[in-house]
């Protein structure tokens, strides 16, 4: 039986999303994304999702980032603009997968917030490719180049 996530308080939902059972958290994450795709019901939870960006695991950090970015299309209060430094701090994460997910998510952010392109560009130059294995640093460099191209348009 599928839980009705939209009836949960922010605190209850965040508890589920930060559950130590990663499989359960992943399932809930996918359901939240499905809901965000169709509705702004979780926009009031933006700050709670933003708090996940500083989470203990890379999964938590990526979730928080991706939820905030997904909510950009409903962002009537310019919360993304205010949270941008916190969100983009993940571009310095120790996990290369986190960097790649963030870079990919930024593409959808600028679709709804094109005014942020010039603010995002300088952050891309702060990514230290030297701290990742060559196989990953090559992929991250490619992601950065593609995103810079998109942001420069």
Per-segment meaning from a language model:
Residues 1-30:
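N-terminal "cap/leader" segments of large eukaryotic alpha-helical scaffolds
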Residues 2-6, 34-44, 72-80, 109-120, ...:
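Flexible loop/turn segments at the boundaries of HEAT repeats in alpha-solenoid HEAT proteins
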Residues 30-31, 66-70, 104-107, 142-147:
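Residue-level signature of alpha-solenoid helical repeat scaffolds
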Residues 2-6, 121-153:
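Eukaryotic acidic, Ser/Thr-rich intrinsically disordered low-complexity regions
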Residues 12-14, 48-50, 80, 84-88, ...:
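Buried hydrophobic core positions in alpha-solenoid tandem helical repeats
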Residues 52-93:
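Helix-adjacent hinge/juxtasegments
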Residues 20-22, 56-58, 94-96, 132-133, ...:
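Short inter-helical turns and helix N-cap capping residues of alpha-solenoid HEAT/ARM repeat scaffolds
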């Amino acid at each position: 039986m599928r839980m009705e996530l939209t009836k949960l308080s922010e605190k209850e939902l965040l508890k589920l999303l930060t559950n130590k059972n990663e499989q359960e958290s992943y399932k809930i994450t996918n359901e939240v994304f499905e809901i965000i795709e169709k509705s702004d019901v979780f926009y009031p939870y933006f700050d709670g999702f933003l708090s996940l960006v500083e989470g203990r695991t890379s999964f938590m950090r990526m979730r928080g980032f991706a939820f905030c970015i997904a909510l950009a299309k409903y962002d009537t209060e310019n919360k993304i603009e205010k949270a941008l430094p916190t969100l983009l701090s993940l571009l310095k994460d120790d996990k290369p997968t986190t960097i790649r997910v963030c870079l990919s998510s930024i593409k959808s952010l600028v679709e709804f917030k094109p005014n942020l392109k010039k603010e995002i560009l300088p952050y891309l130059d702060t990514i230290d490719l030297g701290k990742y294995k060559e196989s990953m640093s090559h992929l991250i460099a490619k992601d950065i180049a593609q995103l810079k191209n998109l942001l420069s348009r």
